[in-house]
Amino acid sequence: MKVMNMKEEERIIKNTIKRTKEYDRTLSPYACKTSECQKLRKEESEHEEFDIRWPFEEDIGRILYCKSYQRYTDKTQALSFFQSAHISKRSIHVQWVSRIARQIGKGLNLNLDLIEAAALGHDLGHAPYGHVGERALNEKLQEKGFGYFCHNANSVRNILYLERNGKGYNVSLQVLDAILCHNG
């Protein structure tokens, strides 16, 4: 196995920074630039300092590795009391949202990695049975004098505090904000 020397590592880092600046110049003035990405905490491990992925690409990977994301697989998007091939799974819904969001973002020259990360993570905190479950939880919470269950806030909670055995993932503030505000 060939070990990279410092000059090679520096060249790759400089090239990544150059590509980031070039990409940022292609974005709309209203878009969040990759170079403006802010992480909640400083990275814990040294190997991430040499990561050639852009910050929002890192967020995509972290969301894809979330156990909450992996649980999308067998969840239906809507509650149904009968079997139907026409009731989509949550994983398909999330893929459709991601695809449509990226298409819109591309047309507006927005940051596609930020959009994809937000779209993939937008439903991580849904209650069982989707919006029906969320309404049922809210009724019970109101009866007991508590606040509301908001799946968008629960999505952020899952990412920051529940994933990785309570360590959470270090996802950018911009992605967390997009997930938190995705439903208005």
Predicted regions and their residues:
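Active-site flanking loop/helix segments enriched in acidic
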Residues: 44-51, 55-65, 69-92
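Short amphipathic alpha-helical segments, especially helix-boundary/capping motifs
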Residues: 36, 74-79, 110-115, 132-135
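Sequence-structural signature of the catalytic-core scaffold of metal-dependent phosphohydrolases
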Residues: 2-48, 65-70, 95, 99, ...
